[in-house]
Amino acid sequence: MSAIVSAAVDIPLSLSSEKNYIVEVVLPGGSTSANIEDGRITAEGASQALATVVYYDGLGRPEQTSRVGFTATGADLLSTVSYDEAGREYRQGLPTPVSGNNGCYVNPSTYGQTAQSYYGDTYLYRETLYENSPLSRTVGVKNPGAVWNAHPKTAAYRCNTAGEVVLFRISSDGVQRVGRYTPGALYVTRETDEDGIWQESFTDKSGRVVMTRQGNGYDTYYIYDDHGRLCYVLPPMAVDGMYNTGNYPDSHTLLQQYAYLYKYDDRGNCIGKRLPGCKSIQMIYDRANRLVMSQDGNQQSESLWTITKYDALSRVLYTYEANPLRSPGDLRQYCKEKLFVEERADSYTAWPGMGYTLRILLPAANDYRLLTVNYYDDYSFLYIEGTAASQLAYRSKEGYGAAYSSAKGLLTGTQVFDLTDRSKYAITVYYYDEYGNPVQTRTRHVSGDYEMTYAQCDLSGNILKSYTEHLDSRGRLSVSESVENTYDRSGRLTRTDYAVNDSLSTDWIYEYDELGRISSKSIDGGLTHAKYRYNLQGWITRIEDVDFVQNLYYENFMGNYGKVRYNGNISAMNWTYRTDTDTIVNGYRFTYDAYDRLASAYSVTGSDFSSGRYHVEYEYDKHGNMVNLYRNGGRGGMIDEMNWFYEGNRVVEITDMVGEQGRYDMKEYRDYNHNGLDYFYDSNGNMTADLDRDIVAIRYNLLNLPDTVQFRNGS
C-alpha cells in the first residue's frame, strides 16, 4: 500500500483546452478525494495516483486515450481511434509510449511518427474493413504490421443453397432427420483467418446458429426445441452416420457415442445432460429454480444423489450425498414444490457437527454422507469445534491486516469432509479487513495439523505480504513461510521475497516493457534471469536465460526453410544451450493441416536449420482425435507407426506396427498388451484400466479423481 504523506502533493497534467476530455484518477491507499484545478490534481498521496485522460472529438466520440505515467519509465501510454465517413471505428492505433507528455493531446501526425520510431513498422493500427452497404457488416480485419496488413482476416456473407444443410427436428424420443433447408432460409457467414483456414456458420431467422462448417465435410449441427433452447449438438462423425431420413432415438449408438444432449423442465431448467460416451447427468430444482439435487453416471448405479441446501439469500450452506429411495420423477415432483432453505441452529437441533437445521428431508432418504459446509456473516459456528476453537479464533499479528468487526455477506468458514472417513473433516476460517480483503486464514486439516496465514492487502486487494505457520496437532510450530510483494504505481508486481523459517530466502524480480508486458524475470539475484521479447501482435518471440535461449517463429522463416504462419501458430522454433565444452543448437519446423491442426514436426540442426535426424507426423479424425502417428529417427529408421482405435471419442486400443526397436536408446512406445482392448472406462468417462501399462483397475472418488491404482502384479 502506498504511504500516506503528511502534506498534500500534486501531479501535473498538461490538458489540452481546445479538446473535450474526461480525466479519471485512481488514488493510492490512504487518499479519499482529489481536486483538479488548473490542470493539477491535489490529494494526499497523489504522487502515486494513476490518471487516464480520454479526449473526444466534436461528435463526442473517444479519439485518444492517455494513461499518464503508466510505463516503466514514467512515459504516457497513448492509443488512438479513427473513424470513417460513416462514423464507424476504422483504425485502432497501437499503444505507444510518449515521454514528457503529462496527459496532453498529441497531434495524429506526431503520434504516427512516434509510433513508427518505437515499433519500426509503418502499419501500426488494427484496421476494420466494412462492406459498402447500409448493413455495415465487417468484411475484413487487418492486424498491425506490414506483414499482417497483407494477410487480413476476411468475412463473406451469403444465403444457403439448395440441399446444402440438413434439417433436423426433435422427436418424442430423439432426433428426426426430415430433409433439408430450402434455399435462402439461412444466413451464412464465412470467416477466413490469415492463413486461409475458413469456417462457415449457418444462422436461422431467429438468430440461432444451426450449423457450423470447418472445411468440407466437417459439419456440426445445433438442434433447438420450440422454446429456442439448445437440446442436441451433433458433431461431424455423428452427422456422417445419420445420412438416412428418419428418427434417431437417444439410445441410438451414434447419439450415445458422439452427441451432446440437454433436457429441460417446464420452467426452462436443464434437468438432464449427456456427454459423449457417458451416462446422463440428472439435475433437480426446487421451487426457486435452484439446483438442489444432481446425479452423475457413477452415482446412478448406487442410486445416490448429491444434495445442496441454501439459506434465504440462495447461498450454498451445505452439500451431502444420500440415497432417497425414490425415482427421479418422484424426486423432481417433490422438490418442485419445496424450498430447500435451512438456517443456523444450536448443536442439539442440528446435524451433528454442522450447526444448521435439516428441515427439508427427502422422502425415505438414508445413508447420508456430509460433503461440504459453508458459514457466512459471523463466527458463531466456532462453538462446534469445542477445544479446537481456540486455535481457529482470530489472533492479531503485528504488521499484518486487522480483522474488521463485521463480516456480513462474506464467507467466514468452510468444512470439507473426508471422502473415505466421514467422521473426519478439514475446517477453514476466514477473517477480513474493512474492505473485504482476506487478512487471516486459519485451517485445521484432516490430519489434525494446523495452518495459519496472515496477510496485508492494499485497497486494490493486492497482497503486500503474507506469513504462514504450519503447526502440528499440539499447536507446535514446524515450518513457517513468509512472502513480501512489491508493486509499481501501475499495480504490476515487481518483486517477491520468499523465506522459509525466517532464514532461507529467495527473491523474484520482474521488469516490464513500455507496454506493460513482462520483459524479464530474475530469481535469486540473477541465478536465473529470463528475458522476453514480443512481436507486434504481442506473441512471445524469444526467451533468453543465462545458459539457454529459445526463439519462436511465426510469420518469419527459421533459416530458409519451412512455411510461415500468420494466425498465431508457431511455424518453427529453436533453442540454444551451453554445456561445459560446447554450445548446442536444436530446432523444429512445424506444419499444419487444412483444419489448423499440427500435422508434422521436423527436427533441424546446423547453421541454416536445413537438416535433422528426427520427425513425427500426425493424422486425425473429424473430431480431432489422433488416429495415426509416425515417428522416424533418421539413421534409426521408423521408430513408431501407431494406430488409435476408438469407440466414439474414447480410445480403446493403440497398436504399434513397427514393434520395439531397442536401438540408439530410443524413447519409443511399447505395446505390452496384444490380446484385445487396452483401455476401459466407467459411466463418467474416467479410464478404469490401461492394460498397455499393466494397470488393471483405477478407482475414482466422488470428485472423479483417482484414489486407487492397481497393477497386474497386485501392487
What name fits each language-model region?
Residues 4-691, 695-700, 705-710, 715:
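Beta-strand elements of repeat-based all-beta scaffolds
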